[in-house]
Amino acid sequence: MTVIYQTTITRIGASATDALSDQMLITFREGAPADLEEYCFIHCHGELKGALHPGLQFSLGQHRYPVTAVGSVAEDNLRELGHVTLRFDGLNEAEFPGTVHVAGPVPDDIAPGSVLKFESVKE
């Protein structure tokens, strides 16, 4: 597999896990504005080495998910801000421009040190 993007969660905002009950996980790179950081999983920003698109594999820790849809600005947001909203609902069309949809259950064991990655499953 080819890694398109990889980063590590460094801290978790006080209200970040609240979105998990709505099947969402919101990320932002270190240095996010304080009012946003409270709601985000903060990570050390990695380099985006390819395009985000359906068919990639998203992984978080030991969990693996197929990417089913990518919003029109999700790739730019990830590249520039380290920001992406992940939805664990398997939709085939992005609900919002900044959303990446994946199929599978919401992870319940996210902690600082968890590795987040997008990978191409084709060589």
Swiss-Prot record:
Q: Which UniProt keywords apply?
A: Cytoplasm, Kinase, Phosphoprotein, Phosphotransferase system, Sugar transport, Transferase, Transport
Q: Which domain of life is it from?
A: Bacteria
Q: Pfam families from the xrefs? A: PTSIIA_gutA
Looking at the record, the residues that make up the PTS EIIA type-5 domain are 1-116
Q: Which residues carry this modification: Phosphohistidine?
A: H43
**UniProt cross-references to PROSITE patterns, sorted A to Z:** PTS_EIIA_TYPE_5 (PS51097)
Cross-referenced Gene3D superfamilies: Phosphotransferase system, glucitol/sorbitol-specific IIA component
Please provide the record's free-text comment about the domains of this protein.
The EIIA domain is phosphorylated by phospho-HPr on a histidyl residue. Then, it transfers the phosphoryl group to the EIIB domain.
Q: What is this protein called?
A: PTS system glucitol/sorbitol-specific EIIA component
Q: Upper taxonomic classification of the species?
A: Bacteria, Pseudomonadati, Pseudomonadota, Gammaproteobacteria, Enterobacterales
